Each structure stands twice: as structure tokens, then as C-alpha cells.
Swiss-Prot record:
Keyword RNA-binding: yes
One MF annotation (Gene Ontology) recorded for this entry: 5S rRNA binding
UniProt family annotation: Belongs to the universal ribosomal protein uL18 family.
PANTHER family, per the entry: 39S RIBOSOMAL PROTEIN L18, MITOCHONDRIAL, LARGE RIBOSOMAL SUBUNIT PROTEIN UL18M
The keyword S-adenosyl-L-methionine is assigned to this record: no
Gene label: rplR
Entry keywords, A to Z: Ribonucleoprotein, Ribosomal protein, RNA-binding, rRNA-binding
Entries under Gene3D superfamilies matching the protein: 3.30.420.100
Organism whose genome encodes this protein: Desulfosudis oleivorans (strain DSM 6200 / JCM 39069 / Hxd3) (Desulfococcus oleovorans)
UniProt-recorded name of the protein: Large ribosomal subunit protein uL18
Length: 124
């Protein structure tokens, strides 16, 4: 087994451990984060119904075509994605969430998304 596969396997084990303990509800959905090598994705999920309320990612046109973000590093884009999902959540009437780091270390871009969401007005 390669080192990359081992890292992913360990991340998936961490993710399963976390998901056993937390779940999103309609009043307090789960803010789920996924981080790829190039992009970051965030979504608000109600686990009782299996419904996604709001999504935001660095791969969508609102972020890609934003002239303020050209030349910014991935962490700065992640903060913007956090603010974007917070704004969309406010539009849906959601103010409080449960944070799901998805097995990723709470550091770097994952932390940047949560900081941006907090700045945008979401309570964790």
C-alpha cells in the first residue's frame, strides 16, 4: 500500500469516528468540509432527512470569477468560501451549525473555512 492510500485510509477512519458522534438537524445542520488538492467544498446537511440545505465551494463561478480573489492563496479563498456559505445559510434562516471537519486536521484551509463562517455570522 502506498503512502497516499494509507493517509486516505486513516482520514476515512477519523471521518467515521467523528460522524458517529455528530449529526445535523434541521435547526442545527452539520457543516461538512471536504478538501481536495486544489479546491475546498462546504455544505450544510440535515442528517435526519438526508437533505443538503446550502453548498459553497472554491470551484463555483461566484468564487472563480471574483476579481478580488485572483492571485490569492488557497487559505484566503477558503475564508471567502466560509463567508459565502455563512451568507447563504443566513438567507435560509440558519444561524447555528455543528462543524464536521471530515477527518481532516483542523488546520490550514479547514480552519480558514470555519473562521470565515464565524466571521459571516454562523455559531458553532
Amino acid at each position: 500500500m502506498g503512502a497516499a492510500n494509507k493517509k486516505q485510509e486513516l482520514r476515512l477512519k477519523r471521518k467515521a469516528r467523528i460522524r458517529k458522534k455528530i449529526a445535523g438537524t434541521p435547526e442545527r445542520p452539520r457543516l461538512s468540509i471536504f478538501r481536495s488538492a486544489r479546491h475546498i467544498y462546504a455544505q450544510l446537511i440535515d442528517d435526519t432527512k438526508g437533505v443538503t440545505f446550502v453548498t459553497a465551494s472554491s470551484n463555483e463561478p461566484d468564487v472563480k470569477n471574483n476579481t478580488e480573489l485572483s492571485g490569492k492563496n488557497k487559505s484566503e479563498v477558503a475564508v471567502f468560501v466560509g463567508k459565502l456559505i455563512a451568507g447563504r445559510a443566513k438567507d435560509k434562516g440558519i444561524s447555528s451549525v455543528v462543524f464536521d471537519r471530515g477527518g481532516f486536521v483542523y488546520h490550514g484551509r479547514v480552519k480558514a473555512v470555519s473562521d470565515g463562517a464565524r466571521e459571516g455570522g454562523l455559531n458553532f
